[in-house]
């Protein structure tokens, strides 16, 4: 880490359709090789499919899915006297959001549907109903933290 300058946070503009910063972050995470327009069409296409299937506001389902996937605690490795302990720590809000976005996209890419639009919409619907592999990832993380609660006094 640099001792001189603190890295500046870049300003990101809200997405054009919903005016939501989180949707823009989601698009940027989906984007591969700088192809923003492709990422935009995937996300908006998935939102259209979600709206058609659930008859609800897609942005509300998206935020519900993110909330259901975001972890509250995680484990971090801490070396104490030759032994490495998995110490449970609370997750900062920015990291919670970043992890939720990352896990949703990874889970969507692993699904079996043919197009990314279908995969993403399926994962968003599953996550908003507390199902799917992204939610399972969150549950596993929480179980790991719960199992290592005995080492919580090693926090830093």
Curated annotation (Swiss-Prot):
Pfam families reported in the protein's UniProt record: Ribosomal_S7 (PF00177)
SUPFAM superfamilies according to UniProt: Ribosomal protein S7
A GO term from the CC aspect: small ribosomal subunit
PROSITE patterns documented for this protein: RIBOSOMAL_S7 (PS00052)
Quaternary state and interactors: Part of the 30S ribosomal subunit. Contacts proteins S9 and S11.
Family classification: Belongs to the universal ribosomal protein uS7 family.
Protein name, entry field: Small ribosomal subunit protein uS7
Protein source organism: Allorhizobium ampelinum (strain ATCC BAA-846 / DSM 112012 / S4) (Agrobacterium vitis (strain S4))
């Amino acid at each position: 880490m640099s001792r001189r300058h603190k890295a500046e946070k870049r300003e990101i503009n809200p997405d054009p359709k919903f005016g939501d910063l989180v949707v823009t972050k989601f698009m940027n995470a989906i984007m591969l090789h700088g192809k923003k327009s492709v990422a935009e069409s995937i996300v908006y296409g998935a939102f259209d499919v979600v709206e058609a299937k659930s008859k609800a506001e897609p942005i509300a389902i998206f935020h519900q899915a993110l909330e259901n996937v975001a972890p509250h605690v995680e484990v971090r490795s801490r070396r104490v006297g030759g032994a490495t302990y998995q110490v449970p720590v609370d997750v900062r809000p920015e990291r919670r959001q970043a992890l939720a976005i990352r896990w949703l996209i990874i889970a969507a890419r692993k699904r079996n549907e043919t197009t990314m639009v279908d995969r993403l919409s399926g994962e968003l619907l599953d996550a908003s109903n507390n199902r799917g592999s992204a939610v399972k990832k969150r549950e596993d993380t929480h179980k790991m933290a719960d199992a290592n609660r005995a080492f919580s006094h090693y926090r830093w």
